C-alpha cells in the first residue's frame, strides 16, 4: 500500500501541524496553526469533529488513557476528555509561547516546554500542584517521557539534551554534541523518541543520522543512515512493536528502517511532512504536512517483510559501542572533565547550587532573562520617587473658569496617535505593526508584561520575546532594532529604551529616563538616523541611534498628537486651538536635523470637517502622508520649500470598487512602491486583532472625477492617470532638488514623462474623434516631449483637423 497514492485530508491551514492517536487507536487527533483541533474516527470517512479553543497556533498535543492535552503559542495548556472534547479545562498558563507537552506514563503529570527557560511539570488534575525544572538559560523545544516512567527528556534550543529522574526530579544526565541547536519555531526535530519497550531512544543527531542511544551507558547503539538527498529530520516515530522506526525529512520525504537490519525498507516520497504517528497495534503510519494536509498509509510495511515482534533476547548495547576509543567518546559527548565542569556550570551555578534546578514556584514566577539590562539607573528612580505625581497630557486641558468650558476644551483636544498601534483587546495589543514586522504585548500581572517581536522575513531575523518590567506603551520597529517608551508614574520617570535585534554583547542597547519632573513620552518615532521623542513637557527630543542627544527644543504648539521620521527628516503634529467646525485644529512642523533647518513651521494639517487624524508616516522614499477618519490618504507636496507645501489626496478608500459590495474599512500601515498598504477590517471592526493580520495593497487613484474601472481607456481613467503620474514626477523632482541626478533617477523621470504623454495622447485621440478643437490644442500644450507633440500633430492630421495641426506645428517650432 505504501506505493499507492494516498488520499489527502485537509485538516488545517498552512503552518506547523501535530498529530497523535488515542491509546486504543480508535481516534486520530490533529492540531495546527488555524487554532483548531480535529478528531478523526479511524476507519471512517465522516467529517472530523472540530474543537476551536486556542487563540493562537496550536504547537503540540499529547494523549493519556482518557484525556488529551494541547498547547499553543497563546501560552496556554488545555485538557480535554477524549469522549467529549468540547468540555475542555484550562490547566496552565505560561508567560511565553508553549512549544510542546507530554503526559507521564500514568497520565498524572504534564510536562510543558516553552520559550521560558523553565520546564514546568503540572498535575493533570490539580493545576496548583506544579514544579519547575531549570536546566539552562535557554528556551526548550521538546519534552518526552520514557515508556518505563523513569526519565523525562528535555530538548533545549541550545542543542543540549537533558534527562531528569521522574521520582527525585533531579538532573541525572545531559548530552552535548547529540542534537542540533535550533530555534524554537524551527520545523526540524530535536526530541528524544523513546522505544515503546526496551528503554532506548532515537534522536536526529548533528551529523544528520538517526542515532539510537541506550540510557544504560548513554552511548549510541547504532546509527541509521538516510538515503541520498534526505536532510533535515522533522519527526521520528517508532512502530508500536518497536521493529520499525520512521523519520520524516524536510528534503526527501519519509524513510522507514528495520531496526534489526538497520536497512531502509520503505520510502514515501511526500515532501513538507512535519509530524508522524503510528497507529497502535496496526501497520498504519499517519503523517501531516506544513500545508495542513493529513495522510494515512495502511499496510505501510509490506506484508512480505512485516515482522510482528522484537527479539526479546537481543541485547540493548552492541559490542561495537563497548569497544569505542576514549577519543571517539570524547568527540561524541565531551571528555569526563568537560562533562563534570558543564554540570557544575550548567546554569551559571556552582556544584553546591544544583538543587536550584528544582523550583516550586507557580507558572507566573519571574524568569531570569536578564531583563534588568535596560532598567533605569537607580539614582534616577530614587529621584523620581521624591516627585509628586502631576497630571500629564490632560493637564493642558484644564480651565478654571467653569466646568462647561472645561468640558468644551477637553472635547476639542485631539488625542495622541501612534501609527501602527492598537488599543487593548482582552489582555493583548499591538505596540507596532508595519512592513518590517509586529511587536505585541501581553498583560501578565500588575508587575510585568511580555513583549514579542516577530518579522515578516524570518530569514533576516528570528522572532524573540522578553519580559517587560517597564510596561511599555509605545514601540517602533525597523530592520535594525526596536524603540520602546513608557510613561512616568508616581514612582518612576518616563523611560525610552532602544534594543537592537542582533546584539549578543548588548552594547547597542540603551535606556534613558526623561529628566523633567513627570515628563512622559507622548509620541515616538525611529528612523535609520535618529530617535524622535515628543513629550508631555512640550519638548521635541532627538537622539542618535546610539542614544546620543542631538537636539532639543520646546514646541510652540501643544499638546502633541503624532510624529514620524525618515532618515534625518522629522515631522511633528500638535494641537493648535479650534477650527471653524469646533474641532481641534492640528498643525505640523518639518525639520531637517542634519542641517538644523525648519522646512515647515506650524502649517495646518488638512483634515475634513469633523474629521480626525488616523495616521501619519513617511513613505519608502521619504514623503509625508496622512490618513484621516473619512478614509482618505493624502501626501504632502513641495514640503521642502518653506510656505509652499500642500496636501494632495491620492486615494479615497470610499470610492474603491470593492467597497460597494462589502462592509469593510482599511487600517493604514504605510505607503511603499506608490501603493497604499493597509489591513482590511470586516464589518464594524476598527482595529486589527490576533492572529496576525494580512496586508493588502491598493494603487493610488486621485479623486479628480467619476472613475469607471470597467473602461481602462475611458476619459476619466486617462485624466486621473496623467494627473497621478504628474504627481509622482513632481515628488521625484522635489526630492532631487538642486543635487546631482543619478542614472536611476534619470530613468524614472523619463518613464514618468512617457506615462504622462501616453495618457495625454490617448485623450487627444478621443478629443479629435469628437472634433473638440480647443481641447486638442489645450492637451497638446501640456505634453512634455518633442516627440509627443509631433505625435499629436500626426493624430490631428489623421482626423483632418488641419487648423489645429498648424497650431501644433507652431508649438513644435518654438520648442
Swiss-Prot record:
This protein's record includes keyword Lipid biosynthesis: no
GO molecular function, one term: chromatin binding
GO cellular component, one term: nucleoplasm
Cellular compartments annotated: Nucleus; Chromosome
Pfam families given in the database record: Ctf4_C, Mcl1_mid, WD40_WDHD1_1st
Coiled-coil regions listed: none
Keywords: Chromosome, DNA damage, DNA repair, DNA replication, Nucleus, Repeat, Transcription, Transcription regulation, WD repeat
Disulfide partners: none
Composition bias, Polar residues: 340-352
Gene3D superfamilies named among the record's database cross-references: YVTN repeat-like/Quinoprotein amine dehydrogenase (2.130.10.10)
WD repeat ranges, renumbered to this chain: 11-50, 53-90, 93-132, 135-174, 228-267, 517-553
Classification via InterPro entries: WD40/YVTN_repeat-like_dom_sf (IPR015943), WD40_repeat_dom_sf (IPR036322), WD40_rpt (IPR001680), WDHD1/CFT4_beta-prop_2nd (IPR022100), WDHD1/CFT4_hel (IPR048591)
Disordered: annotated span: 306-362
Function according to Swiss-Prot or TrEMBL: Has a role in regulating DNA replication complexes. Acts as a regulator of post DNA replication initiation. Associates with chromatin during G1 and S phases of mitosis. Required for the transcriptional repression of the outer repeats of the centromeric region. Acts as a polymerase alpha replication accessory factor and is important for S-phase DNA damage survival. Plays a role in lagging-strand synthesis and Ozaki fragment processing, in addition to DNA repair.
Oligomeric and partner information: Interacts with pof3 and pol1.
Record protein name field: Minichromosome loss protein 1
Upper lineage: Eukaryota, Fungi, Dikarya, Ascomycota, Taphrinomycotina
Amino acid at each position: 500500500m505504501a506505493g499507492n497514492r494516498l488520499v489527502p485530508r485537509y485538516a488545517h491551514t498552512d503552518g506547523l501541524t501535530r498529530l497523535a492517536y488515542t491509546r486504543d487507536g480508535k481516534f486520530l487527533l490533529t492540531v495546527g496553526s488555524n487554532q483548531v483541533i480535529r478528531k478523526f474516527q479511524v476507519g471512517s470517512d465522516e467529517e472530523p469533529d472540530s474543537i476551536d479553543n486556542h487563540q493562537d497556533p496550536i504547537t503540540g498535543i499529547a494523549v493519556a488513557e482518557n484525556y488529551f492535552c494541547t498547547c499553543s503559542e497563546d501560552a496556554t495548556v488545555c485538557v480535554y476528555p477524549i469522549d467529549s472534547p468540547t468540555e475542555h479545562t484550562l490547566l496552565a498558563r505560561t508567560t511565553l509561547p508553549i512549544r510542546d507537552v507530554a503526559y507521564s506514563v500514568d497520565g498524572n503529570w504534564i510536562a510543558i516546554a516553552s520559550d521560558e527557560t523553565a520546564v514546568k511539570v503540572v498535575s493533570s488534575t490539580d493545576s496548583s500542584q506544579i514544579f519547575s525544572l531549570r536546566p539552562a538559560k535557554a528556551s526548550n523545544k521538546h519534552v518526552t517521557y520514557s515508556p518505563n516512567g523513569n526519565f523525562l527528556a528535555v530538548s533545549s534550543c541550545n542543542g543540549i539534551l537533558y534527562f531528569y529522574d521522574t521520582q527525585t526530579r533531579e538532573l541525572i544526565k545531559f548530552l552535548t554534541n547529540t542534537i542540533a541547536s535550533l530555534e524554537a519555531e524551527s520545523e526540524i526535530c530535536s526530541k528524544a523518541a523513546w522505544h515503546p519497550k526496551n528503554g532506548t531512544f532515537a534522536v536526529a543527531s548533528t551529523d544528520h543520522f538517526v542515532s539510537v542511544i541506550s540510557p544504560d551507558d548513554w552511548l549510541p547503539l547504532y546509527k541509521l543512515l538516510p538515503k541520498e538527498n534526505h536532510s533535515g529530520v522533522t519527526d521520528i516515530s517508532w512502530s508500536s512493536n518497536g521493529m520499525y522506526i520512521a523519520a520524516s525529512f524536510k528534503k526527501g520525504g519519509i524513510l522507514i528502517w528495520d531496526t534489526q537490519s538497520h536497512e531502509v525498507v520503505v520510502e514515501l516520497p511526500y515532501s513538507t511532512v512535519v509530524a508522524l504517528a503510528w497507529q497502535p497495534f496496526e501497520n498504519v503510519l499517519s503523517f501531516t504536512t506544513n500545508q495542513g494536509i493529513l495522510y494515512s498509509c495502511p499496510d505501510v510495511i509490506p506484508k512480505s517483510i512485516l515482522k510482528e515482534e522484537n527479539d526479546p533476547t537481543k541485547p540493548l548495547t552492541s559490542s561495537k559501542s563497548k569497544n569505542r576509543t576514549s577519543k571517539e567518546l570524547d568527540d561524541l559527548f565531551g571528555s569526563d572533565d568537560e562533562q563534570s565542569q558543564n554540570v557544575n556550570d550548567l546554569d551559571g551555578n556552582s556544584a553546591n547550587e544544583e538543587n536550584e534546578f528544582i523550583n516550586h514556584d507557580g507558572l507566573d514566577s519571574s524568569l531570569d532573562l536578564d531583563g534588568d539590562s535596560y532598567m533605569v539607573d537607580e539614582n534616577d528612580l530614587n529621584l523620581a520617587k521624591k516627585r509628586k505625581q502631576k497630571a500629564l497630557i490632560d493637564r493642558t486641558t484644564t480651565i478654571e473658569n467653569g466646568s462647561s468650558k472645561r468640558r468644551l476644551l477637553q472635547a476639542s483636544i485631539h488625542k495622541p496617535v501612534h501609527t501602527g498601534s492598537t488599543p487593548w483587546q482582552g489582555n493583548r495589543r499591538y505596540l507596532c505593526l508595519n512592513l518590517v514586522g509586529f511587536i505585541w504585548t501581553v498583560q501578565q500581572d500588575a508587575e510585568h508584561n511580555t513583549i514579542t517581536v516577530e518579522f515578516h522575513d524570518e530569514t533576516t531575523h528570528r522572532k524573540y520575546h522578553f519580559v517587560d518590567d517597564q510596561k511599555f506603551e509605545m514601540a517602533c520597529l525597523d530592520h535594525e532594532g526596536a524603540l520602546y517608551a513608557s510613561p512616568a508614574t508616581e514612582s518612576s520617570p518616563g523611560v525610552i529604551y532602544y534594543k537592537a535585534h542582533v546584539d549578543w554583547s548588548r552594547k547597542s542597547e540603551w535606556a534613558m529616563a526623561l529628566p523633567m519632573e513627570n515628563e512622559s513620552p507622548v509620541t515616538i518615532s525611529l528612523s535609520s538616523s535618529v530617535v524622535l521623542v515628543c513629550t508631555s513637557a512640550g519638548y521635541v527630543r532627538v537622539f542618535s541611534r546610539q542614544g546620543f542627544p542631538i537636539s532639543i527644543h520646546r514646541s510652540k504648539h501643544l499638546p502633541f498628537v503624532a510624529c514620524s521620521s525618515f532618515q534625518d527628516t522629522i515631522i511633528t503634529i500638535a494641537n493648535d486651538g479650534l477650527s471653524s467646525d469646533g474641532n481641534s485644529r492640528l498643525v505640523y512642523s518639518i525639520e531637517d536635523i542634519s542641517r538644523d533647518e525648519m522646512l515647515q513651521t506650524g502649517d495646518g494639517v488638512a483634515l475634513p470637517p469633523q474629521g480626525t487624524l488616523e495616521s501619519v508616516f513617511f513613505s519608502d522614499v521619504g514623503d509625508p502622508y496622512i490618513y484621516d477618519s473619512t478614509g482618505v490618504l493624502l501626501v504632502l507636496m513641495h514640503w521642502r520649500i518653506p510656505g509652499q507645501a500642500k496636501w494632495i489626496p491620492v486615494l479615497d478608500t470610499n470610492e474603491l470598487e470593492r467597497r460597494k459590495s462589502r462592509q469593510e474599512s482599511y487600517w493604514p500601515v504605510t505607503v511603499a512602491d506608490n501603493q497604499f498598504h493597509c489591513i482590511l477590517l470586516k464589518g464594524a471592526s476598527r482595529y486589527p486583532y490576533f492572529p496576525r493580520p494580512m496586508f493588502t495593497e491598493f494603487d493610488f487613484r486621485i479623486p479628480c472625477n467619476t472613475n469607471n474601472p470597467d473602461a481602462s481607456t475611458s476619459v476619466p481613467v486617462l485624466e486621473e492617470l496623467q494627473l497621478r503620474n504628474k504627481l509622482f514626477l513632481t515628488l521625484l523632482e522635489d526630492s532631487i532638488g538642486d543635487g546631482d541626478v543619478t542614472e536611476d533617477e534619470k530613468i524614472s523621470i523619463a518613464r514618468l514623462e512617457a506615462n504622462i504623454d501616453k495618457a495625454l495622447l490617448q485623450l487627444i485621440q478621443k478629443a479629435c474623434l469628437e472634433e473638440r478643437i480647443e481641447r486638442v490644442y489645450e492637451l497638446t500644450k501640456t505634453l512634455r516631449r518633442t516627440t509627443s507633440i509631433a505625435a499629436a500633430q500626426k493624430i490631428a492630421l489623421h482626423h483632418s483637423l488641419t487648423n489645429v495641426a498648424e497650431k501644433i506645428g507652431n508649438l513644435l517650432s518654438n520648442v
